[in-house]
């Protein structure tokens, strides 16, 4: 049994709360396609997906086929969409497990069509046409959609189940960001209209990510794709205070050692922290190998006994040191909240940690190592 005190607590009650918030933010009749890629943003895909399925989520989205297979193997029966498409040789498994995939090339279409024909399971390959409306990543360029759809008709073993796109700057609420999101929405709507003009009847139309859901400035969709908002974090600081979401993840550890140091004493690699007065230093067994960013050196904060303590010196692979001089009553064995809500009321949010680390909340949550840090599920 792993007795290391550095663990992640996942609050399923907070997940349920956030799911309910999202349901209230989308238009009536709009379903939810929960994004559970990257191990549910580090929260653990199995428990999170099982909980969301109980809540009535309409479908799940993952990044690649192996993640979709994991969902099916864990007993998830709701529709699953591979956002990043599949690779050559994966067609038969995709169809056999009744998983849908993004499609953005005729070569993919031909391979899927042939696989569906060969396995003779009397099931078409379900595809969602990915349209590049301005992200510049995956997808059929929006101006090529009419020609692509016309050529797609030659493949009789494919079912165009959905059509979707992805916003590039929906999390930026400045005039330029808003204008580009609206331009993407116009391009997407035109692609959907073209599909219908050519006789396609996609069951699912989706483009709204967490940022678009929060902004509530949506083109017509009958499916929305909440991701980070389900886990209680915000797409960007532009949405701060707009929605009472609850952090689902708490990264915690314990004080392993306390040591008084004299003025002039340096702490950790590179001597980047030097005590200017007598200080009490706590060593805590968490480090960058656990996903606690090294860039939090001399910047990060933690909560002990409801009081804040600053990281003292360079974040190590397995350890950080905290200046706990002003933490009243601190003792070896005390709980340390490194990320998420503390039982005494304060919170180290993913947004706060990301700002100090020079990154984004997504990277903070996804970066907490699953192989080193146990997940404990509550609620």
UniProtKB/Swiss-Prot annotation:
Keywords per UniProt: Isomerase, Pyridoxal phosphate
Checking Pfam families in the record gives: Ala_racemase_C (PF00842), Ala_racemase_N (PF01168)
Q: Which cofactor does it need?
A: pyridoxal 5'-phosphate
| One GO location term (cellular component) | cytosol
Q: Which domain of life is it from?
A: Bacteria
- EC identifiers of the protein: 5.1.1.1
Catalysed reaction(s) here are: L-alanine = D-alanine
N6-(pyridoxal phosphate)lysine modification, residue list? 37
Pathway it belongs to?
Answer: Amino-acid biosynthesis; D-alanine biosynthesis; D-alanine from L-alanine: step 1/1
Q: Which GO terms describe its molecular function?
A: alanine racemase activity; pyridoxal phosphate binding
Role: Catalyzes the interconversion of L-alanine and D-alanine. May also act on other amino acids.
Spell out the NCBIfam families in the cross-references.
alr (TIGR00492)
Q: Which family does it belong to?
A: Belongs to the alanine racemase family.
HAMAP family with a match to the protein in the record: Ala_racemase
UniProt protein name: Alanine racemase
Task: Give me the gene this protein comes from.
Answer: alr
């Amino acid at each position: 049994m792993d007795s290391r005190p550095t663990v992640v607590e996942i609050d399923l009650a907070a997940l349920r709360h956030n799911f309910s918030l999202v349901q209230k933010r989308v238009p009536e009749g709009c379903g939810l396609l929960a994004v559970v890629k990257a191990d549910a943003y580090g929260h653990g895909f199995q428990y999170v997906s099982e909980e969301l399925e109980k809540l009535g989520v309409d479908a799940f989205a993952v990044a690649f086929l192996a993640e979709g297979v994991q969902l099916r193997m864990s007993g998830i029966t709701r529709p699953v969409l591979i956002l990043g498409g599949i690779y050559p040789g994966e067609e038969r498994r995709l169809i056999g497990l009744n998983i849908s995939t993004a499609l953005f090339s005729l070569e993919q279409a031909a391979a899927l069509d042939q696989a569906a024909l060969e396995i003779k399971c009397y099931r078409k390959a379900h595809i969602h046409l990915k349209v590049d409306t301005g992200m510049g990543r995956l997808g059929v360029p929006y101006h090529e959609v009419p020609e692509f759809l016309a050529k797609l008709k030659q493949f009789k073993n494919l079912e165009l189940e959905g059509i979707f796109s992805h916003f590039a700057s929906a999390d930026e609420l400045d005039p330029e960001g808003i204008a580009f999101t609206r331009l993407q929405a116009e391009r997407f709507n035109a692609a959907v209209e073209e599909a219908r003009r050519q006789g396609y009847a996609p069951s699912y139309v989706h483009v709204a990510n967490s940022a678009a859901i929060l902004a509530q400035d949506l083109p017509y969709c009958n499916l929305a794709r909440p991701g980070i908002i389900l886990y209680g974090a915000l797409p960007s600081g532009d949405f701060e205070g707009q929605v009472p979401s609850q952090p689902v993840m708490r990264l915690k550890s314990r004080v392993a050692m306390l040591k008084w140091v004299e003025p002039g004493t340096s702490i950790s690699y590179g001597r980047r922290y030097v005590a200017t007065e007598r200080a009490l230093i706590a060593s805590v067994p968490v480090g960058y190998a656990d996903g606690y960013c090294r860039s939090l050196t001399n910047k990060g904060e933690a909560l002990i006994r409801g009081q804040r303590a600053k990281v003292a010196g360079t974040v190590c692979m397995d350890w950080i040191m905290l200046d706990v001089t002003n933490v009243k009553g601190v003792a070896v064995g005390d709980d340390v909240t490194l990320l998420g809500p503390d039982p005494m009321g304060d919170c180290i949010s993913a947004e706060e940690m990301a700002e100090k680390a020079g990154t984004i909340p997504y990277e903070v949550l996804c970066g907490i190592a699953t192989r080193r840090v146990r997940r404990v599920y509550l609620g």
